[in-house]
């Protein structure tokens, strides 16, 4: 619901999904690397780089370290070790390509562009190198050169949409809006329909062609109302052209799909305060960045993480303040367990962005994952002190307090979060559930039971709540019939959750139903293993 849906990534970045580790065995064979020792001696001083990593003197060792880092998507380490290896054999095209890709993924654009130039001297049809240089040309407003680079490279549907839309934005940058829209309309594939209309609308809006922009925005919005980026652009356009009520309606409709998204919340607050919303895209650079952001977000959802990282890095090169692109990139690093890199990316969200608080919350949660619990809790407490009505921050702080067994503080924090809502909503079930756990751990069972029941009122058949309340009743020897119904229902809803099945097994055990207990407990062990 954040970025537009597209067919699976291929094309310019299709080579990126080749696992780095596939060539790891070659690192053990110096002859496989083809090192040119005389060339390396001439190049080493010129290519020396500062690095936080301790690199060795062995080319094979550095190459192996680079491959492992690449396989683990540790982009900083991969870039460092590939560049170090390249010092020993500066004309090796495979090393140049790997160092180039790693530099792109790490966001080191000066290095990446220099390596792209070198790579194309040895491999003239490298699509990703052409893409990178095309984007550099757009940034430098060298639009004919950009189109020349974008016209080269591999084939494939994703390469077609990338090159087509970036070429369109190069025409827009040159002021040739008619040709830009004609270029967008070359995308005939029905799977690209919404993307086509979206970018045609953005270009028409930039050109001041209100009639064309209105038609294209309406077509894109009518086909995809659950995509934040499209809804945001559509609503901003409507507001600037005298349709504030429609802008509010569009945001409120999206809020029903994804409640309380900070971008929507901020936009609605501005609209209700009488402020005029700025357009989503104000320059050709931002338009081209939007293409790359959309493709990167798609790649991240599809599991093509390296391609997604590269597209997002290129997007941020063109438009460094796009908070959604930053958050999407950080989220990918987080999913790859590259927590330090994720924190670094989260920290680059602008202070005035609606996403700043969310980035700070995610950073705090990652600090806890890294074992820096005190620092994490301080960060969350600072956010809550500054933004006492931010439900996400209060929830995160409550969860951290609960994980640290600070149950009294956790319950108080959850209460503050619940007090922010004027009416009960289904989405609040988790807050009642978490507060119920905090009360139960304090031995305040009456309060805990009331919260669990409230959670089930808001979300009947929620398996986690059924499991917790049902097991608690069995443990206390009360409401046994209803408790077993709850536990069995929880297992029906989550039959592969070993912890839920385990609760049912222990409930049988507590009541002396040992045969049934053994059956469920053995199944729980299998599911957990």
Regions found by a protein language model. Name each.
Residues 61, 95, 129, 163, ...:
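TPR alpha-solenoid repeat register
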Residues 54, 88, 121-123, 155-157, ...:
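Structural marker of alpha-solenoid helical repeat scaffolds
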Residues 67, 101, 135, 169, ...:
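Residue-level recognition of tetratricopeptide repeat
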């Amino acid at each position: 619901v954040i970025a537009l849906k597209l067919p699976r990534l291929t094309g310019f970045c299709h080579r990126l999904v080749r696992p780095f580790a596939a060539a790891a065995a070659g690192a053990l064979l110096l002859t496989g690397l083809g090192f040119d020792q005389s060339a390396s001696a001439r190049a080493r001083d010129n290519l020396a780089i500062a690095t936080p990593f301790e690199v060795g003197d062995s080319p094979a060792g550095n190459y192996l370290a680079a491959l492992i880092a690449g396989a683990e998507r540790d982009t900083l380490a991969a870039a460092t070790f590939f560049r170090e290896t390249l010092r020993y054999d500066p004309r090796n095209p495979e090393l140049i390509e790997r160092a180039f890709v790693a530099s792109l993924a790490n966001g080191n654009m000066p290095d990446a562009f220099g390596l792209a130039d070198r790579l194309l001297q040895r491999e003239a049809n490298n699509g990703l190198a052409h893409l990178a240089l095309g984007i550099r040309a757009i940034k430098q407003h060298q639009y004919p050169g950009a189109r020349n680079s974008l016209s080269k490279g591999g084939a494939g549907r994703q390469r077609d949409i990338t090159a087509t839309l970036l070429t369109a934005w190069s025409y827009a940058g040159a002021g040739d809006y008619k040709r830009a829209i004609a270029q967008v309309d070359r995308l005939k594939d029905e799977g690209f329909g919404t993307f086509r209309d979206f970018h045609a609308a953005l270009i028409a809006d930039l050109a001041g062609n209100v009639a064309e922009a209105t038609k294209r925005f309406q077509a894109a919005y009518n086909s995809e109302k659950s995509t934040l980026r499209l809804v945001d652009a559509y609503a901003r356009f409507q507001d600037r052209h005298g349709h504030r009520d429609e802008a509010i309606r569009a945001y409120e409709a999206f809020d029903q799909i994804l409640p309380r998204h900070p971008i929507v919340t901020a936009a609605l607050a501005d609209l209700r305060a009488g402020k005029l919303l700025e357009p989503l895209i104000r320059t050709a650079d931002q338009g081209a960045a939007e293409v790359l952001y959309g493709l990167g977000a798609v790649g991240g959802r599809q599991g093509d993480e390296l391609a997604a990282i590269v597209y997002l890095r290129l997007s941020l090169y063109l438009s460094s303040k796009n908070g959604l692109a930053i958050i999407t990139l950080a989220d990918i690093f987080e999913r790859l367990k590259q927590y330090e890199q994720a924190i670094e990316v989260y920290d680059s969200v602008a202070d005035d962005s609606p996403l700043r608080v969310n980035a700070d919350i995610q950073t705090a949660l990652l600090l806890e994952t890294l074992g820096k619990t005190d620092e994490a809790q301080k960060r969350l407490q600072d956010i809550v002190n500054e933004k006492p009505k931010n439900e996400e921050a209060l929830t995160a702080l409550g969860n951290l307090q609960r994980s640290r067994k600070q149950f009294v503080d956790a319950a108080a924090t959850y209460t503050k979060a619940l007090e922010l809502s004027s009416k009960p909503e289904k989405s609040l079930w988790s807050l009642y559930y978490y507060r119920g756990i905090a009360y139960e751990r304090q031995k305040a069972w009456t309060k805990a039971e009331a919260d669990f029941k409230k959670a089930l009122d808001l979300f009947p058949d929620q398996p986690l709540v059924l499991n917790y309340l049902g097991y608690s009743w069995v443990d206390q020897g009360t409401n046994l019939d209803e408790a077993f119904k709850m536990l069995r229902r929880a297992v029906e809803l989550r039959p592969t959750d070993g912890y839920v099945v385990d609760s049912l097994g222990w409930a049988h055990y507590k009541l002396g139903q040992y045969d049934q207990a053994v059956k469920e407990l053995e199944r729980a062990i299998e599911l957990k293993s």
